[in-house]
Every structure is written in C-alpha cells, then in structure tokens.
C-alpha cells in the first residue's frame, strides 16, 4: 500500500517514469502524506542543477529547466487559469467559466511570467548563497534551501487537499474527497524535518516551510471567496506559487539573518 501510494504520487507529481495505473492513483489519492515525501526527492534532484560550472544566469536557467523537467509543466496550467480567473470582474460562476476556457488571457500570461521570473530570480539568489556559504553543515546550504522549499510547496498543496472542498467535479474533488483535515498531521510530521536541512542555520529551512504553508493559506482563502472552493487548478497554482515564495524566503533568511 505504501509503495503503491508513493508510485502513484511520483507518477502524478513528477515526470519520473514509474508508470501509471488505477491502483496507484487510488492509493495516492488516499495518501496526502506522499506529497512531502516526493518533495524531498524532487528538491534533491533539481538542486543538483545549481552546481553546473557556468555563469550565474546560465545556472539560473538550468535550475528552471530542471524544475520543469522533473515536475512537468502541468501545474503551470493551473497558474494560467487562476491568473485569468483573478483578472475577471464578475461572480463565482463567471470565474469558474474562465477556468474551463482553454484560451490564455492577459491575467494568465502575467501570472505565468511572474512565476517563471520568480523562479529564475530565486535561482540567482541560490547561486549567491552557494558562492558565499561555508561548509559548516552536513549539506550544502543551497541543497537544504531547495529541498525545504520543495517539501514546503508539496506540503502546502497537500494541506489544501486535506482541508479544501472542491467547487465542482474534477481533479480537485477526486483528491479532496478522499482526505480529511486529520491527515494534515502526517503531512506536517513528514515535512517538518526539512527545516533542519540548512543546519547549523535552522531559520532558512524553517522560513521556506512556513512561507510555503502561508502561501497555501492565502490561496485557500482567495479560492473559497472567489471560486467557492479548491479545484485542481488551485492545487496546481498553489504548488508553483508556494515553491517560488519558499525559495525566496529561504534565500532571504540565509543572506539577511
């Protein structure tokens, strides 16, 4: 059951070729704790791109490419849809209609640009951390920050899965309908150790985790008021927004405190 759930999580949350089948999906849908576990693996893989021997802008590009090579670009569709919905001056029904529209509007374009730009600038900050940080801890600081941010982003998404209600049938309801608020305990328990990955400095890892969760809270509040609940697009957008926010928080905490 555990391995099947993890395989389902890897198949859904990444592009790692583990195969997809109904049993794995069903096990994953009932196991939100798999989100942060996958975050540890994804964070470790994409962090390796920061050690490319190249100028900082090239390393930043490599990092962005690595993120989407490992996780895919499916969540960016959620960013675009939520961006378009946020730009609508109308009621919930109008915003939901926009979510189902495959055309990309101005709001979605701006949202996508900001997320990718945010990811690239965070990578530049990580390059600076790598160049100036010492080797006092068990892991290079940039690896700790990236993994903590990815675990935080996945835990943030899992939290919405556990506490959210979908406004309509779809991916959101397929996940939220299988979990309960009590499942957040296992999510938080598995995500918490990521705060120690920047040891001996705990603040950068802790900041990344907490800011990711705070991002989820803000997205959840907005989606409930504007959309009536947590849809699949909201979950995808939460992952992307929380990752960017968490990376910047980790870099700021390392360089300024």
Swiss-Prot record:
HAMAP family: CobS. GO terms for molecular function: adenosylcobinamide-GDP ribazoletransferase activity; cobalamin 5'-phosphate synthase activity. Signal peptide: none annotated. It is found in: Cell membrane. Belongs to the CobS family. Its cofactor is Mg(2+). This is Adenosylcobinamide-GDP ribazoletransferase. The gene is cobS.
């Amino acid at each position: 059951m555990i391995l099947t759930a993890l395989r389902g999580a890897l198949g859904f949350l990444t592009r790692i070729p583990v195969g997809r089948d109904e049993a794995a999906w069903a096990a994953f849908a009932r196991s939100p704790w798999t989100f942060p576990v996958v975050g540890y693996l994804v964070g470790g893989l994409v962090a390796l791109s920061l050690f490319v021997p190249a100028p900082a802008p090239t390393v930043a590009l490599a990092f962005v490419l690595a993120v989407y090579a490992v996780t895919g670009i499916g969540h960016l569709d959620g960013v675009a849809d939520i961006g378009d919905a946020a730009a609508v001056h109308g009621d919930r029904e109008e915003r939901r209609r926009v979510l189902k529209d495959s055309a990309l509007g101005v709001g979605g374009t701006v949202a996508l640009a900001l997320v990718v730009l945010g990811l690239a600038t965070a990578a530049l900050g990580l390059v600076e951390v790598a160049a100036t940080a010492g080797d006092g801890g068990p892991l290079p600081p940039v690896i700790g920050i990236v993994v903590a941010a990815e675990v935080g982003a996945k835990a943030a998404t899992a939290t919405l899965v556990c506490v959210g209600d979908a406004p309509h049938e779809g991916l959101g309801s397929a996940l939220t309908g299988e979990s309960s608020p009590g499942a957040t305990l296992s999510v938080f328990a598995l995500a918490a150790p990521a705060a120690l990955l920047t040891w001996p400095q705990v603040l950068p890892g802790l900041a990344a985790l907490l800011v990711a969760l705070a991002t989820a809270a803000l997205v959840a509040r907005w989606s409930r008021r504007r959309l009536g609940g947590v849809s699949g697009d909201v979950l995808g957008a939460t992952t992307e927004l929380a990752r960017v926010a968490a990376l910047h928080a980790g870099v700021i905490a390392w360089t300024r405190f």
